[in-house]
Amino acid sequence: MGQDLTFKRHRRLRQTAAIRNMVRETKLHIDDLIYPIFVKEGEGVRQEVPSMPNVYQLSLDQLDAEVDEIVSLGIPAIILFGVPAEKDAVGSAAYHEHGIVQQAIRQVKESYPDLTVIADTCLCQFTDHGHCGVIEEGKILNDPSLDLLARTAVSQAKAGADIIAPSNMMDGFVAAIRAGLDSAGFTDVPVMSYAVKYASAFYGPFRDAAHSSPVFGDRKTYQMDPANRLEALREARSDVEEGADFLIVKPALSYLDIIREVKNETGLPVVAYNVSGEYSMIKAASLQGWIDEKSTVLEKLISMKRAGADLILTYFAKDVARWLNEEK
């Protein structure tokens, strides 16, 4: 080849693993991870979710062993989802003092006061119709639902939740919850809002885990259209104005562009929710031997951080923590 060619040799910075690590722009840390736990009423329950390998519904007597493992791995935070024994039209178990989530919060905080406990604040797991609000003649009522969400948030804060994470996508839900928390004296409890939550096909396995599928209709009148980008920014701005401290984008993998735009637009900490369908697809493919699970998971989570996520809520958190610890 002639000596008069001029071009940039980018491969110089890829010659060894050490050099590649030195110039790596995005890195994944255990401190980035939040692990979801499904707590279920009953005793001796450790029931694997059929569509989510290695994810379990746990009764309170099984919870300590799970949390012990999480803490030993260095994972800094969990988020709790409740699976109640009884449901009703207004989801009263969601805001009951002795609801399953409230009991789990108290139990975890008593044993591990330094572990950050996030409470998912919604009604769908607790209503007999499976929707995230009050129903009247087949319609989900926005404003009456806000009162119940605020009651739920306050009850969770009283139980000791460090962060409240409202997920139901009613208009004004952050304002209602922030006002409720402040009035009850919980001005220092932050709100991690599901600010941008799409009406996604990727939620199927979660509804299997949380027993939260709607009995009728769907959630498209309150969750977002997957085709919309500008609407996501309007939703995020509204939640910032109403007092949100963190913003969740859900799902994550199909919405990396939204994660970046929300981060640029708001400057608040952004949480990527690596949802159940994303988890189960990788699990299914890896069980068939079609992909390498570890490499695929790490690449996926790195893409979320590269897009702008500060934190990642993922069912892979324990696996990722083990892999990262092995690399130390």
Swiss-Prot record:
5-aminolevulinate 1 binds at residues 207, 219. Binds 1 zinc ion per monomer. Mg(2+) binds at residue 235. GO terms for cellular component: cytosol. InterPro entries: ALAD, ALAD_AS, Aldolase_TIM. Its cofactor is Zn(2+). Zn(2+) binds at residues 122, 124, 132. Keywords: Heme biosynthesis, Lyase, Magnesium, Metal-binding, Porphyrin biosynthesis, Zinc. One of its GO terms (biological process) is protoporphyrinogen IX biosynthetic process. Pfam families: ALAD. 5-aminolevulinate 2 binds at residues 276, 315. It catalyses: 2 5-aminolevulinate = porphobilinogen + 2 H2O + H(+). It is an enzyme of class 4 (lyase). The keyword Lyase applies. The active site is at 197 (schiff-base intermediate with substrate), 250 (schiff-base intermediate with substrate). Gene3D superfamilies: Aldolase class I (3.20.20.70). Its EC number is 4.2.1.24. CDD domains: ALAD_PBGS (cd00384). GO terms for molecular function: porphobilinogen synthase activity; zinc ion binding. Pathway: Porphyrin-containing compound metabolism; protoporphyrin-IX biosynthesis; coproporphyrinogen-III from 5-aminolevulinate: step 1/4. Homooctamer. PANTHER family: DELTA-AMINOLEVULINIC ACID DEHYDRATASE (PTHR11458:SF0). Catalyzes an early step in the biosynthesis of tetrapyrroles. Binds two molecules of 5-aminolevulinate per subunit, each at a distinct site, and catalyzes their condensation to form porphobilinogen. Belongs to the ALAD family. This is Delta-aminolevulinic acid dehydratase.
